[in-house]
Amino acid sequence: MTKLGKPVTQRQLRVGAMINQALGMLFLRDEAKLPNLSTKEITVTEVRMSPDLKTAKIFVMPLGGKDTEEVVTKLKEFSFVIRKVLSKKIVMKFLPKLFFVKDDSFDYAEKIENLIKQTNK
């Protein structure tokens, strides 16, 4: 479900998966050539598309979970370059604007796991 209570469409999921895969390969091969950032260590965990497919919220996490804020800040800084390289890989009428966000799901899962372990003791 989206914020407005509307279900996510199949098209949003398909485009999100396509962008997720393309970004993963782009980061793995370091095709964007971003200065001061090793993109081989960045994991794209999820891509959420807006209903009009004009914006993409990209959840990222560096391997090891170190310097997450710094990595997200640099990705935001170079989002134009990443979008330009991505446009050569994905054929769409409009490539969405990319918004990079820190993925907290691993921290949240670890917190819940610790709570479960505490209740079992």
Please place each PLM-identified region on the residue numbering.
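Charge-rich, low-complexity N-terminal segments
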Residues: 1-55, 61-121
